């Protein structure tokens, strides 16, 4: 099994939800994900029930980018190692898309601009049904450190209204409380 390309991204959390307001803001978190593009299936099962990685390959092709030399779609497989809990609001789908796009770029020596990466991630997330809005602000936050305020109605290349490098990680702490724990505590009272 050969690693054709490798990409990384990180999780994020919403500060302002785009679906209700048309403006979204998300902040990067120190939760990493690494995606590898492989020529054979990974030894570890990749859980992609929503098929966002398949949709992402289609977005890559629609954008006019090549597949790795000598490989067809059916020859490509993924390996994912993630510290981002799924379905907890920590932007695991957006981070997976960004890391996978970076792996494709690494495998093909094609390096789309950041706004092109966000556009392909948004297209894949909507096509796979994991997002109604494309999670544009989430993809930006998974792509770069800090936080961004994004106008999701604007063209992606022009949609970042404000951004900031973020807080010094030494100055703040994010606590992740599993949903099951909060349900248990609610029933005890």
Label the predicted regions:
Residues 1-88:
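ATP-binding N-lobe of GHMP and related small-molecule kinases
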Residues 2-9, 170-178:
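Short amphipathic
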Residues 4, 15, 156-162:
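Local beta-strand/beta-hairpin segments that build beta-sheet-rich folds
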Residues 7-8, 17-18, 26-29, 131-134, ...:
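Solvent-exposed alpha-helices and their adjacent loops that cap or buttress functional pockets
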Residues 39, 143, 152, 171-180:
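Short, structured patches in soluble enzyme cores that scaffold and shape functional sites
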Residues 73-158:
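Gly/Ser-rich oxyanion-binding loop with an adjacent helix/lid
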Residues 182-189:
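Conserved small/polar residues in nucleotide/adenosyl-binding loops
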């Amino acid at each position: 099994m050969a690693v054709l390309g490798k990409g990384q991204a990180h999780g994020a959390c919403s500060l302002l939800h785009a679906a209700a307001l048309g403006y979204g803001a998300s902040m990067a978190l120190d939760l990493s994900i690494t995606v590898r593009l492989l020529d054979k299936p990974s030894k570890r099962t990749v859980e992609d029930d929503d098929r966002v990685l398949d949709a992402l390959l289609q977005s890559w092709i629609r954008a006019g980018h090549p597949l790795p030399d000598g490989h067809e779609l059916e020859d490509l497989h993924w390996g994912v190692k993630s510290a981002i809990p799924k379905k907890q609001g920590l932007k695991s789908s957006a981070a997976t898309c960004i890391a996978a796009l970076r792996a494709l770029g690494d495998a093909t020596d094609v390096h789309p601009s950041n706004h092109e990466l966000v556009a392909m991630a948004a297209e894949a997330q909507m096509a796979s049904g994991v997002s109604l809005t494309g999670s544009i602000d989430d993809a930006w936050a998974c792509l770069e450190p800090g936080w961004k305020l994004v106008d999701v109605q604007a063209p992606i290349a022009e949609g970042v209204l404000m951004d900031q490098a973020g807080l010094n990680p030494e100055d703040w702490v994010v606590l992740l409380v599993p949903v099951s724990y909060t349900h248990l505590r609610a029933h005890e009272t």
